[in-house]
Amino acid sequence: MSIASTQADKKSSNHPNKIKVSGVILVDKPQGMTSQQVVSKVKYLFKSPNHDSKKAGHTGTLDPMATGLLPICLGEATKFSHYQLDADKSYQATILLGSQTDTGDADGQVTAEAPIPAFDDALLDKVAQQFLGAQQQIPPMYSALKKDGKKLYEYARAGIEVDRPPRDIVLKAIELKAIDEQQIQLTVTCSKGTYVRVLAEDIAKAMGTLGHLTALRRLQVGDFKIDETIALADLEALPLEQRQTYLLPVDACIDISAELSLSSEQCERVQMGQRLNVIDQLTDDVQSYITTAIDQHLAANNNSAADSQNIEDTNDDNEQQLVHEIPIDIRLIDEQGAFIGLGAVSLNGRLQPKKLIQL
């Protein structure tokens, strides 16, 4: 069970007479607005003499030209927005072949042109397969990434190109379809950090020509889908009470299935930042979740899951202790089943409060 978004007993600490607006809203971002402009608009739409909506942020930037799913976290939900920053994302894009722009999309200036070779579905399928899976991608100059404290697009606007280290990305699904003799449609599911503008340019090059994006729409972020969104104009047309019905719970961004139920006394203690011994409360499901997460943690640090099993089986007391002390984030709920935050729990039963919502 999740905490409701705008309960009257949740007063803002900055404005004690106001209700803190907390939750996640899925907005269909319109073309032409920056992601931050959409956030500012949403903050305004949830503001009232009785409601405080000053704290808000999105879970991953969309370019001004792009449309589609933009999850926005308000209030206490901002504590958990990073879970969606790391989530896989799906996009649908239109690539115009035959020309390249300085920004990689239709907002830029054409810098080069090339003839477009004939192509069919078989060729598009072959090209798509070349890009499936793990690879490295060099970020574009027109991006908000920083070098020496300065954003790359600031260098680009000054006509300066700087070296950018390639980044590891994974394309988990990709499909190319012909629209006409000059345009193709790209549908892709990719890992965080993927620039679809760069992908579009690379696809065009693989086809023997140049290309740039003329349309980009985000369809999915983690488990959030485009058909769950509300258009910004539609949200604005609603009275405040109806806008609030579109708020998802504060924990909507969290992709963690394991949960630990705490007594009222334990809830009070974790709210004060105290560690707890919960070894007797770790169910088989929770222990299994922690063990699996530890395996994944070790694998991410260049150890295989088999290696982690060997560590558990070893007679080396220090290594055995190390594995059992690795903290894993799980949900914390109270006796009524209401979400109260996240805690880091290890197999030795140690619970460290991590991110708690303010009741």
From Swiss-Prot:
Which residues constitute the catalytic centre?
63
What protein name does the entry list?
tRNA pseudouridine synthase B
Q: Name one GO molecular function term.
A: tRNA pseudouridine(55) synthase activity
Gene designation: truB
**The organism of origin for this protein:** Psychrobacter cryohalolentis (strain ATCC BAA-1226 / DSM 17306 / VKM B-2378 / K5)
Q: Which cysteines are joined by disulfide bonds?
A: none
Has the keyword tRNA processing been applied to this entry? yes
**Which processes are annotated in GO (biological process)?**
mRNA pseudouridine synthesis; tRNA pseudouridine synthesis
Q: Which family does it belong to?
A: Belongs to the pseudouridine synthase TruB family. Type 1 subfamily.
